[in-house]
Amino acid sequence: MPVMKGLLAPQNTFLDTIATRFDGTHSNFILANAQVAKGFPIVYCSDGFCELAGFARTEVMQKSCSCKFLFGVETNEQLMLQIEKSLEEKVEFKGEIMFYKKNGAPFWCLLDIVPIKNEKGDVVLFLASFKDITDTKVKITSEDKKEDRAKGRSRAGSHFDSARRRSRAVLYHISGHLQRREKNKLKINNNVFVDKPAFPEYKVSDAKKSKFILLHFSTFKAGWDWLILLATFYVAVTVPYNVCFIGNEDLSTTRSTTVSDIAVEILFIIDIILNFRTTYVSKSGQVIFEARSICIHYVTTWFIIDLIAALPFDLLYAFNVTVVSLVHLLKTVRLLRLLRLLQKLDRYSQHSTIVLTLLMSMFALLAHWMACIWYVIGKMEREDNSLLKWEVGWLHELGKRLESPYYGNNTLGGPSIRSAYIAALYFTLSSLTSVGFGNVSANTDAEKIFSICTMLIGALMHALVFGNVTAIIQRMYSRWSLYHTRTKDLKDFIRVHHLPQQLKQRMLEYFQTTWSVNNGIDSNELLKDFPDELRSDITMHLNKEILQLSLFECASRGCLRSLSLHIKTSFCAPGEYLLRQGDALQAIYFVCSGSMEVLKDSMVLAILGKGDLIGANLSIKDQVIKTNADVKALTYCDLQCIILKGLFEVLGLYPEYAHKFVEDIQHDLTYNLREGHESDVISRLSNKSTVPQAEPKGNGSIKKRLPSIVEDEEEEEVEEEETTSLSPIYTRGSSVSHSKKTGSSKSYLGLSLKQLTSGTVPFHSPIRVSSANSPKTKQEADPPNHGTRKEKNLKVQLCSLGTAGTPELSPRIVDGIEDGNSSEETQTFDFGSEQIRPEPRISPSLGESEIGAAFLFIKAEETKQQINKLNSEVTTLTQEVSQLGKDMRSIMQLLENILSPQQPSQFCSLHPTSICPSRESFQTRVSWSAHQPCLHLQANGAHLYHGNVTSDIWSVDPSLVGSNPQRTEAHEQSPVDSELHHSPNLAYSPSHCQVIQEGHLQFLRCISPHSDTTLTPLQSISATLSSSVCSSSETSLHLVLPSRSEEGSITHGPVSSFSLENLPGSWDREGMMSASTEPLENFPVEVVTSTADVKDSKAINV
């Protein structure tokens, strides 16, 4: 016997419970999220609070639970701090405080803040209740003022008045304590004698069923219902039979059925007891487990009928109590139990065989009842004519045919009760199914009238039941047939696809609930044939709740009618997610009943109840709106949703209302689900004024530009050292190089000075740039006068090159190794930093109707994160490569130390004595004191000095060029590139020098010449000298200095050989300094001090 189970999913009824409890006192309360430590935002506010404070619900949502928006000038600051402290410590607070309404009117409020815990004991919500006590406060204040006036009139009684006022204050205080004590006692009593806590927990509450509560859909209850059904049929058969055929004439015959009758009465009494403990399904479809509600429901429905039907009349026969025939008539009240059968008939109608069986049973039962009536009519006719010799009744005819006629004034004899009942049942059945055969016929007027009624009922029953049983089932139970058909299809689908039990339960509950709501009627299918005018009026009536919102007050009736056609009804079960974070929003939802919660990262952002609107602020041009949170049902929720696609169509037809709708929906939404809503606001504020992007420094004369990803508008200038560290090789065009060669030295040095003062120095060698790729070198390359720079979100800028023609790029630059015999002339290219100017980024302002503001902002943030990640990976890789190189050099030095003889460690220290910058002459002079013999390099020459070394240098900080070996502080400055100007052989020949500091130690970086027969070209050598560098006391150094002939061809200069036998056995790295010269043709020279400074032994001649 299938039974509608009802809605059994566990629900979170916290909001309903709180609202129900506050209806008895005051319904002014708010709920705040206790898991967000910053501000504790409000997630729900009652209608009473909105009326009390004068704020709309949308204005209160997401504000702080401390109610700072209600504070005013007379609000006690100490109470403010206590409220904040109680929220931080998550403890209860209660006090009287003055608040201010939205219109500025003050009112005294009794504020009570209580923390709400979940099933784990964690505080997840704050419940703040507000009670207006302004009248009480005003009354007390007016009494005090009256006393003050009386005090002013008679000072003699001032002492008495003050004492009285003081005593009244004490009594008031004591009465308050007594009230609190009484409340505490009530709380204690409630906690002791009541199962419910003082405040409900915010959790999904399972149905708490007592073990003495019987489920109405359980197997035992189904079997018991079948037993009661059989007992009901027994009563329907035996009661009319006993009343009509037996009466009180034959008690011995009556006693034979007394046992079964008593058993049936006992069953009915037990059924009454079980009904008081059996669950039932409410009108809303929920299963009721509460014993009190079950008792009330049963008493007000079927209890009276069941009680009368269960009266133990047959116990009177069991105790030999003489009864009159009226008692037998009272037993017919038990036939009211058949009404319970009609109530449950829909449960038995899922199978056609059961329906047919029930119909046949009802037909036979009707024939049985009519047979009893037919016998009573014949009996009464015989008794009324007992004094006459009248023998025309059907009982007389039956007695004659059976040879048992009546005699003794028709009081004795006659057919037996058994024969009479069979004959009566035969007559009624033949009359119901046909017109009869005449062997048992009606002779008297009463019998004929009854026969006529029987024939009419028979014709109706025959036409309804036997004529077309299938049509009867289809007409009467077509809806249920469809229900069971769909249920069977659903179960088959679940069985075929092996769906899990949880998903199966959800599908069945959703189907049953939606069916109970609309009874299987598809409103769209039903209304599609109606004209649009009538269909619009019908849908407006069906959706009148959502159309009565203030959002649609300005809409015309035509607009509302068009909009009502796009409103759908939806249903959500407890625990079901209406929307997931990141889903495309398809509709705007209005909560008709139930409660829901908005979740993000398992935190409650808002609680939605009846009358709340949830969706997103719209724009006419919106295509896709992504949700920023989850929406989950706490209870069974009925929703009405406006499909966005249809909404945009309607707004397109009514443009005069569209703008108003877009503005108003932002204020009417209880919670805005638009993804990036907060970011959209920030981006609009930041894009009101477009900040032009700073022009980063480049490294060459570039006409064309490559497309780029630039930094944000707020980024600062990018230094050239950072730019060049990201590029492996920098070149310059031949035309630009030629113009620089033919220019005057003053203009060239002026340009260089301008670049130095602006913080940029162009590199004249691609190898030097590649050597600065290490993180340490990059850090040291920053000039000290620029200080620290903020971290920037870099974006890759691709610029286009613009030259007179395609430059020849040497493919040998790829690996940095060149054949020593090659003397091929190649072009070099220089990119001037003053030529690079990225186009300023123009960020279009985002208007309020701009649809892509949030999307573009998020895309920009993602791009920044990706570029930052890529930059960090490149930096990490560079550091690893640099560390690997250092490790290799350390291993080489260790091997040399092991293989070479140990020598005492000494060093050649350099001390700067003076520096005299002069921008007019573009030259300064620096003198170095060498306590020990040192090697000094000048253009086209190198000399070994035992005393002072003097060279020309300009625009260089002396602390970056040399250092005292005795100083202990570490220098964190980056590598410094400077121009050395010498003129021993070539006029205005600029040299190139780089001094790199590592703490307070120094090491040199050398660059090999571009083309040479002995030194490896295009190779950067870091000559880091340590102990036992020189393997022998006699070492000769060969330098090959290229020079420029008059014809412009490149030739090799003189080879200078210097003996280093007077040098100490080893040079300490601290005192090592060197300079590499670069003639006008940009061919650097290199200083080599020992074989340990080069990786290729063929590079020098020892």
From Swiss-Prot:
Residues in the bilayer without spanning it: 420-440
This protein's record includes keyword Methyltransferase: no
Any single GO CC term annotated in Swiss-Prot or TrEMBL for this entry: monoatomic ion channel complex
The organism's taxonomic lineage, starting at the top: Eukaryota, Metazoa, Chordata, Craniata, Vertebrata
Family (UniProt): Belongs to the potassium channel family. H (Eag) (TC 1.A.1.20) subfamily. Kv12.1/KCNH8 sub-subfamily.
Function of the protein: Pore-forming (alpha) subunit of a voltage-gated delayed rectifier potassium channel that mediates outward-rectifying potassium currents. Elicits a slowly activating, non-inactivating and slowly deactivation outwards potassium current at depolarizating voltages from -30 mV to +50mV. Shows no obvious change in the activation rate from different holding potentials. Activation is strongly dependent on the pH of the external solution.
Keywords: Glycoprotein, Ion channel, Ion transport, Membrane, Potassium, Potassium channel, Potassium transport, Transmembrane, Transmembrane helix, Transport, Voltage-gated channel
Ranges of the Extracellular topological domain: 247-255, 320-327, 375-419, 441-448
Record-given protein name: Voltage-gated delayed rectifier potassium channel KCNH8
MF-aspect GO terms: delayed rectifier potassium channel activity; RNA polymerase II cis-regulatory region sequence-specific DNA binding; voltage-gated potassium channel activity
Topology in membrane: Multi-pass membrane protein
Residue intervals of the PAC domain: 93-145
